[in-house]
């Protein structure tokens, strides 16, 4: 509409994501790193490692209701609120977020290593075990 178009003059509005040389170079460097450093393959491999480990934890712990996600984007649905689990994970050196009151959210960097996945799975096992003992489940 002409009245909206007339509200600003040329040059008054710009975009952070505009095609300037610096942002284009940064975008190219990021895409190059993703492809040349094998980040997609690592995401798939580490996601599968997480999934297998989490399924084992689900078999062991009745507090875990469901595991879902794709690649490294994973949700762990619990039968109870996750606040105490999050605090316990911090004590174990793992920072994790939640989605809703009862879902732990795992969204690590694409460069995550096997030892990091192992550490997270171990910490989850410890913290969930303590929480089950506390709740007597």
Where are the regions that the model predicts?
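Conserved N-terminal phosphate-binding loop of PLP-dependent enzymes in the Aspartate aminotransferase
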Residues: 1-137
């Amino acid at each position: 509409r002409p009245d909206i178009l007339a509200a600003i003059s040329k040059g008054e509005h710009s975009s952070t994501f505009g095609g300037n040389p610096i942002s284009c170079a940064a975008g190219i460097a990021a895409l190059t790193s993703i492809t040349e450093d094998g980040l997609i393959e690592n995401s798939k491999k580490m996601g599968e490692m997480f999934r297998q480990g989490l399924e084992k934890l689900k078999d062991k712990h009745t507090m875990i209701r469901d595991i879902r996600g794709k690649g490294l984007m994973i949700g762990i649905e619990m039968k109870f609120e996750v606040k105490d689990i999050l605090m316990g994970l911090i004590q174990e050196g793992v920072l994790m977020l939640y989605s809703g009151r009862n879902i732990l959210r795992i969204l690590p960097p694409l460069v995550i290593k096997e030892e990091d996945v192992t550490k997270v799975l171990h910490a989850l096992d410890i913290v969930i075990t303590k929480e089950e003992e506390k709740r007597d489940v």
